[in-house]
Amino acid sequence: MRVIVKGTSPHENKIITIFEKQEDGKYKCYNIEDKYFTINEEQKKEYRTKPRTTPYLFIKKNEKDKKLKTMSLKQQCESINETAKLLLELTNGKINLYRTGSTAKTALQLFYDLCEPPTPEEIETYEIDILEKSSTGACIWGQKGYKNIGYKYDFVSEYPSIMDSSQHKFPIGKGEQKTFTKKEFKNLEFLSFGLYHVKVHCDDRRVFRENYDNWYTHTELNYAKSKLNYKIELIIDDEPNALLWDKSKLITGKALFGKFVTYLFRLKYKGHTEVKCFLNALWGTLCQTDMMKIIPTEIRCDQQILSITPCDNGKYIYETARLDKFYENNFARIKPFILSYGRVKIQNVILQNIDKVVRCHTDGIICSSPITNIKLGSDLGMLKYEGKGNCEIINNNNFIFIEIDDDI
């Protein structure tokens, strides 16, 4: 049976409508048939909760994309309609923005259609806290004050390459809590698939990212132990100090995501850059928190506050998530593992070029001299040379890179 993504229209094309909220609380909308019109909050909820009965497919105005955020509602709508028409023809209907709308929903629907994945088990409350605490972000640092020639490299579609790997596994079932003694943990030569509550004694943040909640995946701990020879100290308190998965609860990235990644990467490789956003969006979409925006009189005990935003009327908007249904999708168990696979991948490159690398950000690095000990290329997952430039590193997050003629 085909899985239908919530908020999409599975059998009928809709009118793509771009909207943005105005200061009066109403929503200004635009589509190519009705042009500009305005709806209130109740109408918006009615339209968006019943996408199969309304003629419209609503998409929030994009304020993040560098190109799109400079456009008006009309310009964004025209741009998306052009892309929708192109993709519909290019993919023979496999990607139909007139039915799915947003990048996230389109990627998710294509994943279900191409891969027909197994149904993951419900994520239990005891898993959520550990999954979140183990989900350290990307490797980001810079050699402050560096001002010289830089050579830029990055991995080709790093996260999709991890998802397409037969070497990397992901959980699709419930993890089992375990409490190790220090003796038991010390006797483990190799840590099996799971999450561990430990203290890692790190002396070089270029090659290892510390987690301040002290929860790590087996991947980064095995790397810290075998490659870096770091001391790993088990934490013992009143709670379990590991969440482990049996082999029967795991699936390889290739088996789970392979058809999705292969299909889109082939199109991207042929120059159809319109599909890049879907290729990169899937894993984040699967890990999305099921958030609600509310102006409450009180926060229920089954809700966790994620953020608080003040309103002009003196009230506050709370972003919350249910503690018993924290994620939108039960594939969200992949979150800490895909992040750690990505970190360890680039940290291995840094380790082999420790005297050259002056900046790292997620899947890209800048070096003071060319890399010669790693095979470069443009295939999925390979390290690719991006160019040479005058580089100034201001801090971990900010740098200046002005490309110059390349003699490599």
Walk through the language-model features, giving the residues of each.
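Conserved acidic
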Residues: 1-408
